[in-house]
Amino acid sequence: MNHPAFAAHSTLEAPAWVKHKKLIEWVQRVAALAKPERIVWCDGSQEEYDRLTAQMVAAGTLRRLNPAKRPNSYLACSDPSDVARVEDRTFICSQRREDAGPTNNWIAPAEMRATLDGLFDGAMRGRTMYVVPFSMGPLGSPIAHIGVELSDSPYVVSNMRIMTRMGRKVYDVLGEDGEFVPCVHSVGAPLAAGQKDVAWPCNDTKYIVHFPESREIWSYGSGYGGNALLGKKCFALRIASTMGRAEGWLAEHMLVLGVTSPEGKKHHVAAAFPSACGKTNFAMLIPPQGMNGWKITTIGDDIAWIKPGKDGRLYAINPEAGYFGVAPGTSEKTNFNAMATLKENVIFTNVALTDDGDVWWEGMTDEPPAHLIDWQGRDWTPAIAKETGRKAAHPNARFTAPASQCPSIDADWENPAGVPIDAFVFGGRRSTTVPLVTEARDWVEGVYMAATMGSETTAAAAGQQGVVRRDPFAMLPFCGYNMSDYFAHWLKTGVKLEQMSVRTPKIFCVNWFRKGDDGKFVWPGFGENMRVLRWMVDRIEGKAKGEEHAFGVSPRYDDLDWSGLDFTREQFEQVISVDDAAWRKELALHSELFDTLKQGLPVALQDTRSALEKKLTA
């Protein structure tokens, strides 16, 4: 268990470059509770990363991929019980239950702290506790915030180095008394003296806990990304959303992209889609044939922090430094830029291994390889798949890759001031009812659209698949406070923008997933979504027309640019039509959502629903 390579920083004593007394005392308190064998103060260097990955290869946690095929890249395969976020074990422990709201799990803070004290007592015995300093957002940005994660998982440390700005430079920004979000993580698998470790330690008991008032995160029992990489959903959305409410900004489950016209005019769009609904594909979109001169650039693919600038407009950063993307379905056809990003320096999790030491997943190629080792270490062939239905890669298999490797990365992706947002887009996976694109007539109507959006569940959350659930703003699993208060915060943001007399971002709702009578998707999606994006940009510029209906404004067939695509008026009608009977049922479902959220639900949203109902029956 001895790691002499870490001797320089393997101590309860902090290195000289850590000058933050409260941070040091906190590390000492957690160490006294969790009782690790050693403490390593991470510096974020390449040497440290190389040591950790070599250590994990030796332990069987990682497999080094063929350097000729996939340089400096690794494959991790998790325990089969630890493959996704665990929403039923995720808690918002606010002082008052009503502050967590009906969509979050709540336990009284004192009770939860007693539970965690018991779980973490000796939880890191026999293991190393890593002190991982990280910045969410460019170092020193006025939109960025700092966190420090204490974890007994080298897998977490390695992923955090890719996903955040991690290392010694964070302490320079933090100084002696800067604010940071304290994050504590353990896989919950202490080792007795002489006990052999397993390749993927975890515990059947899992807790992912947030204390909004003290801005703390505690995670126990899981080594999986969303549960263990605490800078991601836990900090960047759940805790940050509560910070944003208190401080007047937004932390959102959104991609951010730049769209530049052939004339060189650039706009920025932030878009929210539930997990595995095409967020990364949209963020890295390549304009299709016939739309020459248009260019899409990527600022972020998953999370946006949005703060008012000095001019009153909303400015966004991507708080992450990497992509933690869903692998299955990603291919050179569906997302060329993502595949190019994955050529080197990647950690893959729960994908399949090819016989020549590379990776594969469902959807990567038209034909699967003749033989693979699946994500659970078993032989896999197309014949086995046909007979058993077994997937080679887990449906929620992931890649962790540096954002800097993306060919479509925006020149401003690390601009500390952020980029100005011209439009918000919201979308879910709906096979019926919701049109291809609708523009809200005003901010309140846009907030209503986002508040009532629905999507089918995905493999990113453990549980049932294929069921439509309401997912307001794509934030249902990620909002760190009462959802009704969250809606009110969005409405208040709109009022502030109006008071500042700045151009308010337009709000659009999209649905790429309408199906025809044959059960197939009608809209081709992927790069063709550029045609919808162009209409949005032209609406911002006042150049494009549309047709008003009960729910807003949608394009007519001739309002879209069809150059290079054979898509008939009949097909367009299938994806754009508004069925009044279906929408009356939809509004009834909106009422069910509002009944769930009735405590504190803004009157403006109830009034909007009533107005829509009247329009439908007029």
Curated annotation (Swiss-Prot):
Gene Ontology MF, one: GTP binding
Similarity section: Belongs to the phosphoenolpyruvate carboxykinase [GTP] family.
Origin: domain of life: Bacteria
Needed co-factor(s): Mn(2+)
Organism of this sequence: Paraburkholderia phymatum (strain DSM 17167 / CIP 108236 / LMG 21445 / STM815)
Residues that, per the record, bind substrate: R85, Y224, G225, G226, S275, N396, A397, R398
A Gene Ontology biological process term: gluconeogenesis
Assigned keywords, A-Z: Cytoplasm, Decarboxylase, Gluconeogenesis, GTP-binding, Lyase, Manganese, Metal-binding, Nucleotide-binding
Subunit structure: Monomer.
Cystine pairings recorded for this chain: none
EC nos: 4.1.1.32
Group of enzyme by EC: lyase
Catalyzed chemical reaction(s): oxaloacetate + GTP = phosphoenolpyruvate + GDP + CO2
Protein name: Phosphoenolpyruvate carboxykinase [GTP]
Lipid metabolism among keywords: no
Coarse class of the protein's main subcellular location: cytoplasm
Subcellular location: Cytoplasm
Cofactor: binding comment: Binds 1 Mn(2+) ion per subunit.
Binding site residues for Mn(2+): K233, H253, D302
NCBIfam families documented for this protein: PRK04210.1
Signal sequence annotation: none
Pathway it works in: Carbohydrate biosynthesis; gluconeogenesis
Cellular component, GO, one term: cytosol
Functional summary from the UniProt entry: Catalyzes the conversion of oxaloacetate (OAA) to phosphoenolpyruvate (PEP), the rate-limiting step in the metabolic pathway that produces glucose from lactate and other precursors derived from the citric acid cycle.
